[in-house]
């Protein structure tokens, strides 16, 4: 709930402040007597503080879930048999459904949908040029939560598995860095709201 409310706040309120900032950086808001840019800076400071609270609450919740036999894992903490299962699952279920894109100078940047999760990778060509690779992680045909075999309540997120195997999607490139991102668009100009 916190995260979806935060996305909505950024789409609407921060988006509006960004519009104001682009139009005129000197206008001050009546109640606070600060500019749009100063408001955005204050919002970012407060969001960083709130995100730390959210992260602590998440860690606490995940520990409690472990007490009930439910554990969300990353690939590094998977057992050997789980890693084999995840590799097969990726190669047979996920890989055929991926839609990878490579961003280059002569190609337009792909449209990234609002609030969707993307795996992004910095790739290096054989001639040492950098490219950006992007894979959408949302897929209506696949569950976001992957249940590991054995019925022990162990799960992995789809986007984490895609990020782990992203190098096998972009064969012929060296992976220099990778991350998951989510785009939150300004509600005033969002084409896919």
List the predicted regions and their residue ranges:
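N-terminal non-catalytic structural scaffold regions of very large proteins
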Residues: 1-193
